[in-house]
Amino acid sequence: MIGDTMSGIIDSYIPVAIFLAVGLIMPPMTMFMVKQLSPRSKAASKYTTYESGSVPTGTARIQFNVEYYLYAIAFVLFDIEVLFLYPWATVYKGHGITSIAVVEMFVFIFILLFGYVYLWKKEALTWVK
């Protein structure tokens, strides 16, 4: 009886193992195929910057304002929040959730709103100061 239960649990993880194996094999396989199938050119003109037919002057590197990074970090944080909220809302709509889960989600949302208000008060969301 215990062996039957264990085999059922192991069988339920077979799709996860397959997904993990494919996920680990595909990136190196793709990189290998790109390296083997891509055209190769040793011409020096392939490594220069193209500027509408004119000869490039100076370097292509520029310094970005640090404010752009603040926007990027804020976007990533709020995007990850949505990734946590969407499955919760789907389960809540489909099956219903206990009141403790609702309280936990409100605490999570409160922490997110606190972070948003903090960014707003520090004027991190102001584009031009």
Swiss-Prot record:
GO annotation terms (biological process): methanogenesis; methanol metabolic process
Topological type in the membrane: Multi-pass membrane protein
Family per record: Belongs to the complex I subunit 3 family.
The keyword Membrane is annotated on this UniProt entry: yes
Principal localisation: membrane
Reactions catalysed: methanophenazine + reduced coenzyme F420-(gamma-L-Glu)(n) = dihydromethanophenazine + oxidized coenzyme F420-(gamma-L-Glu)(n) + H(+)
Localization per Swiss-Prot or TrEMBL: Cell membrane
UniProt enzyme class: oxidoreductase
Membrane-crossing residue ranges in chain numbering: 9-29, 64-84, 95-115
Gene3D superfamilies referenced in this protein's UniProt entry, alphabetically: NADH:ubiquinone/plastoquinone oxidoreductase, chain 3 (1.20.58.1610)
GO cellular component: NADH dehydrogenase complex; plasma membrane
Quaternary structure, from the entry: The FPO complex is composed of at least 13 different subunits. FpoA, FpoH, FpoJ, FpoK, FpoL, FpoM and FpoN proteins constitute the membrane sector of the complex.
Organism: Methanosarcina mazei (strain ATCC BAA-159 / DSM 3647 / Goe1 / Go1 / JCM 11833 / OCM 88) (Methanosarcina frisia)
Name of protein: F(420)H(2) dehydrogenase subunit A
EC number: 1.5.98.3
Entry GO MF terms: Methanosarcina-phenazine hydrogenase activity; NADH dehydrogenase (ubiquinone) activity; reduced coenzyme F420 dehydrogenase activity
Temperature-dependence annotation: Optimum temperature is 39 degrees Celsius.
Protein's job: Component of the F(420)H(2) dehydrogenase (FPO complex) which is part of the energy-conserving F(420)H(2):heterodisulfide oxidoreductase system. The membrane-bound electron transfer system of the complex plays an important role in the metabolism of methylotrophic methanogens when the organisms grow on methanol or methylamines. Catalyzes the oxidation of methanophenazine to dihydromethanophenazine. It shuttles electrons from F(420)H(2), via FAD and iron-sulfur (Fe-S) centers, to methanophenazine (an electron carrier in the membrane).
PANTHER family: NADH-UBIQUINONE OXIDOREDUCTASE CHAIN 3
pH dependence: Optimum pH is 8.5.
InterPro entries listed in its UniProt record: NAD(P)H_OxRDtase_bac/plastid, NADH_UbQ/plastoQ_OxRdtase_su3, NDAH_ubi_oxred_su3_sf
